[in-house]
Amino acid sequence: MLQPKRTKFRKVHKGRNRGIAGGTEVSFGTFGLKAVGRCRLTARQIEAARRAMTRAVKRQGKIWIRVFPDKPITEKPLEVRMGKGKGNVEYWVALIQPGKVLYEMDGVSEEIARHAFALAAAKLPVKTTFVTKTVM
């Protein structure tokens, strides 16, 4: 599972998922999976999609993960009254804005890449689209 090795602070404020995305172009591979909406991707969802893609391409080609879960999400235990401080860190998320490239792939045909990204998209809570590298 992806998570930071060390952080400056253990817990963070909830905040809001606003603004525009960075990393909107396919830069490493030839094909990419781009988010259309905004969401919070958990480390488990990122890993599940990666596994689906890896199995679909049968370990050929190369896959890049362009997102990293760097925000800790806390939860209080069940049946605990409100107050008494912030809960414990339960999982890590990456905040996704529209236009962000989530995964990239190279070394496979477009047909295989489309199939692999379709399997990966089914594991993600955000609507996505298939993009290719634009050469200028």
UniProtKB/Swiss-Prot annotation:
MF GO annotations: rRNA binding; structural constituent of ribosome; tRNA binding
One BP annotation, GO: translation
Stored InterPro entries: Ribosomal_uL16 (IPR047873), Ribosomal_uL16_bact-type (IPR000114), Ribosomal_uL16_CS (IPR020798), Ribosomal_uL16_dom (IPR016180), Ribosomal_uL16_sf (IPR036920)
Keyword Ribonucleoprotein: yes
Top-level taxon of the source organism: Bacteria
PROSITE patterns according to UniProt: RIBOSOMAL_L16_1, RIBOSOMAL_L16_2
Gene Ontology CC: one annotated term: cytosolic large ribosomal subunit
Keywords: Ribonucleoprotein, Ribosomal protein, RNA-binding, rRNA-binding, tRNA-binding
Described purpose of this protein according to its UniProt entry: Binds 23S rRNA and is also seen to make contacts with the A and possibly P site tRNAs.
Family: Belongs to the universal ribosomal protein uL16 family.
Complexes and interactors: Part of the 50S ribosomal subunit.
Protein name (Swiss-Prot/TrEMBL): Large ribosomal subunit protein uL16
Source organism of this protein record: Actinobacillus pleuropneumoniae serotype 5b (strain L20)
Gene symbol of the encoding locus: rplP
